[in-house]
Amino acid sequence: MPSFDIVSEVDLHEVRNAVENAQRELTTRWDFRNVEASFELNEKTESVKTTSVSEFQVQQLLDILREKMAKRGIDGAVLNIPEEMTHSGKTYSVEATLKQGIDTPLAKKIVKMIKDSKLKVQAQIQGEQVRVTGKSRDDLQAVMKLVREGELGQPFQFTNFRD
């Protein structure tokens, strides 16, 4: 029976390239001349820290980062940006974490969404991924479309397609 896995993974190498490109753009931007602003990627905690001297500039930095990530083929929804900024001394900073894997509540929501669609497929949670099995390829492709169109706040990839 045909099956595939729904996963949510981020290529850290591409994220590193996007952060380096964003840092490079900072040196050429006129509005960031003579301003202490930076991007820092922490691969162990899978987070990107943006730092600048004002809240507005931190928001601009996040926009630059999203733009560079989009150019590298990474969806901007992988960034989990906190509501409040950290303010210490004269700098503002935001540490945005990268969403890796599908957590259990979201996986349950995906399985429920698939079951509510009345397609003839079975969905089961396997760790940080969801396995979908069905008799027809068309049903599996309908599930892919359903998950892509569902407003779940996280980008998904479909891997391990077996026939």
Swiss-Prot record:
Family note: Belongs to the YajQ family.
UniProt xrefs under HAMAP family: YajQ
Keyword Nucleotide-binding: yes
Function: Nucleotide-binding protein.
SUPFAM superfamilies: YajQ-like
Keywords (A to Z) from UniProt: Nucleotide-binding
GO cellular component, as recorded: cytosol
Coiled coil: none
Lineage: Bacteria, Pseudomonadati, Pseudomonadota, Gammaproteobacteria, Enterobacterales
Source domain of life: Bacteria
InterPro entries: DUF520, UPF0234-like_C, UPF0234_N, YajQ-like_sf
Name of the protein in its database record: Nucleotide-binding protein PMI0103
Molecular function GO labels: nucleotide binding
Record organism: Proteus mirabilis (strain HI4320)
